Amino acid sequence: MSHESSEKAHKAIENVEDYCQTLTRHGNEELRTNLERVITTFKSNLMHSLLDIHDLYEQTLLSERKSDAEKNMEVRRVIERLEGGPHSYNSRPAATTSTSNYNLSSTTPLISDLRDRGGFSYLNGGGLGNGLGNGLGNGLLSSPYNSSSTHYLHERQRQTSHDGTWRETTTRTVDTPSGLERRVVEHTGVIDDHGRKWELENIVLEKGHTGLGFSITGGMDQPTEDGDTSIYVTNIIEGGAALADGRMRKNDIITAVNNTNCENVKHEVAVNALKSSGNVVSLSLKRRKDEAFLPIGGNFGGSTSYLRSGVTPSVSAGNLQHAIHSPSAPIHPPPPPPVHHGSLSQLSVGQYRSTRPNTSVIDLVKGARGLGFSIAGGQGNEHVKGDTDIYVTKIIEEGAAELDGRLRVGDKILEVDHHSLINTTHENAVNVLKNTGNRVRLLIQQGTGAIFNDSASQQFMPTTPILRPSSVQDYNRSQMGSQSHLSYGGPLNTSYSSQAPIAIPLEPRPVQLVKGQNGLGFNIVGGEDNEPIYISFVLPGGVADLSGNVKTGDVLLEVNGVVLRNATHKEAAEALRNAGNPVYLTLQYRPQEYQIFESKIEKLRNDVIAQSRMGTLSRKSEYVRALFDYDPSRENSVAPHRSMGFNYGDILHIINSSDDEWWTARKVHENGEETAEGVIPSKKRVEKRERLRRKQVNFNSGSQSLGRNSSTTGLENRRGSRSQLSFSRKFPFVKSTDRLNDLNEESSNVAEEPVWSYQAVEQQAINYVRPVIILGALKDRINDELVNRDPSKFSSCVPHTSRPPREGEVNGRDYYFVNKHNMEEDVKNNLFIEAGQFQNNLYGTSIQSVRDVANQGRHCILDVSGNAIRRLQSNANIQPISIFIKPSSAQQILELDSQLATNRQDDRAMSGEEAQAQYSRCHRIEQTFGDLFTQEISNVHSANDVLSKVYSIISRESQTPIWVPRH
């Protein structure tokens, strides 16, 4: 290739980007989209190649533990991937292939020598035939990425400690439709005195209307023939919470229910613990690890307790008679969900469109509330007469479907991760959706909306009851199973009424009912802390439903003359239970109040579930984030024995903080494991010694907040590269001192620099893509690198301005052009995380703009000051990933800037004065906002090292739950 051709090739991607920007006319959308895919794919492939080479250098070539032969083998693997071409990094499962079996025990070796390589194995998603039959010709001699099927890369590690406990960690790198995903599954257990391995598992179930859904036997008064007194699970009931959760197995041993020990106890103790456990139940299970272990037989004495009913302690014992069954009664486990291969199940999206119009594919990422929608329909459970399709009947607030915005009530779900739902049963559709991973691909057919009422009156339909532990009374006994909620922890089955919505008066109204065999047919909640008694659910086909006069959201005021306006839940339940026919009710419809109550209870429930799933921390425990680096070897005085070092951002579990000088703590790893106990300096010691050090060296600089005079955003130092203009030109106010949001910052008047030592933190589940804020050295360069390298994951947000649009500018793309007065009001109402004025025009970043980027599944790159971090946390309840780049000197800033600017011909080099000014500014930022950083990056050797650590932190902090400041 000639030198001239080489130069043209280097500029090719820039030329394509420039051409893409010119496609603004209507009709160019498809061409523009395809060109953007070309650009994104190229950059993604380039990034993968660079990361491969970086890992090869860091982990293999620099390793002193690997032989030359091992290094050569790793080099060959990289060659295979690189020579595989662009498709090596972009394999996707073909839409026309059949469903793959991901449960095979056989695996395909990674390379052609068929030997195990240190716990790694390669599995072709197509099954054994593809793995070994075709694999010898294709998979084994080519890159594992170069295939049209879904692949797994497994790594399994086992650790056994001296005390008999073991831990097995399985790491899978999965090639999904959305790219490579790393999934980690951990199993823990113990080895008993007989050398038998037991696997331990903690699960959380929500009773809802379906109950726990399993039966138990055993106990000290009902031992097995060999004397085993354990509490065993004898059956898992179809439609119950245990089956929906999927983790409990038949023959599991229950060792604890919430905080009640169930080992070496009578059968009645376990039954009572489960009955009184409340709506959210935490279970500790153990099972034999041995695969050859046979299921327990039926030779148990006593009774088997059937735990399907969702009753609470307020229900009388007489109502529980139906829940006890003899062990002689045959119990058949539910059959596995069928796999359907209808005539449409193997079609591509394009082929679907020929038979089903308005089809499209959407990807959802589960959050704290799961997929966030309800379904109805299926064979034998038609939602629309003559139609067995699966319909979306409700979109759950703040769920993944609502955040995505494309799924609507009335849409049909045709496929889930290539599993066809055509002509399937309702139960199978639920199981398929329940067993999906964090990222779910749906093939949907958009509905016309003709058979669904999507107006505000839809609230009159029966809604999902929000259940509070020990505060729900069930007045029916029938099975309700025509609609399934797919929100996180939501009840499994709820009926969907076909009754048309009607107007309901808001004043108190009399209602007369006659009890039937199934009671009155509605549920009540409330009655605690002076709350009204609400009707939370109306059973379809029940007495209340058929009357047409009882609605979800009604407040129960009287029952047969008994006033319930200030009654407790127990008093209301007794009044309803003792009421004779006919039953005279006084109801008042209060939809707004009920929605507030429902939201409050749902938040409480989600908090309980989230805390239980993440391993609820003991109240006596204290978790902190370190806000400084600590090296025991640099202690001026003699450090105690077992001193433990740590870095900024490390999470520490404080075990003992009674001493004024030294604390006992354990370091918490990313996977939740904790190190051995060590000794760390106390908060008091750290702060006292730091203040003494500052006094000795007369350390007076940086005591003021960055405020408005120190140009905290740092944008004025941009040097005009084309990519940087996407940030800097949109915020010219950074050159002005008129920073609106900073006028009232209390931190600007702080007389003494704070000393950052430890910050109390707690875990919080998140269901959104977190924005990213880079602070410190070269943050402008790094922001540009993130957006340019991976625009599918990172994006800037559209700012607001009060100035009129210029030629070529488009509202919603370049800026949101708004009225100045309205923008000033929004700033006062805390709707902006940062705003300022330039040449009498306002510029700013709104909270909604940040959310818009997150709803697209991308990290919003924010070029803002540290004050914006506080505003995001306090005003928007958004926890950004804030990374501080800490330089060691001004010279290091010059070197890193030079490395980042190597391939940018339109950038001039940073001067020494600019580097020194930026170094001083970094020092002030650290002193002012040191408690707001998620992580700090220091002691780096190259620009690539910085970028690698930034990517690593963002990836790690994108997983839920996260550690957030505890207030």
Swiss-Prot record:
Bias category Basic residues: which stretches?
A: 682-696
Keywords of the record, alphabetical order, are: Cell junction, Cell membrane, Cytoplasm, Membrane, Repeat, SH3 domain
Residue stretches of biased makeup (Pro residues): 330-339
User: What does UniProt give as GO cellular component?
Assistant: adherens junction; apical junction complex; apical plasma membrane; basolateral plasma membrane; cytoplasm; lateral plasma membrane; neuromuscular junction; neuron projection
- Domain PDZ: from-to ranges: 202-289, 361-448, 510-591
GO biological process assignments: cell-cell adhesion; chemical synaptic transmission; embryo development ending in birth or egg hatching; establishment or maintenance of epithelial cell apical/basal polarity; nervous system development; protein localization to synapse; receptor clustering; receptor localization to synapse
* Segments forming domain SH3: 619-690
Q: Which residues form the L27 domain?
A: 5-65
- What membrane topology does this protein have? Peripheral membrane protein
Q: What's said on domains?
A: PDZ domains are required for localization at the adherens junctions. SH3 domain is necessary for let-413 dependent lateral distribution. L27 domain is responsible for homooligomerization and interaction with ajm-1.
Family indicated by similarity? Belongs to the MAGUK family.
The entry's protein name is: Disks large homolog 1
Organism equals Caenorhabditis elegans
What gene does this protein come from?
dlg-1
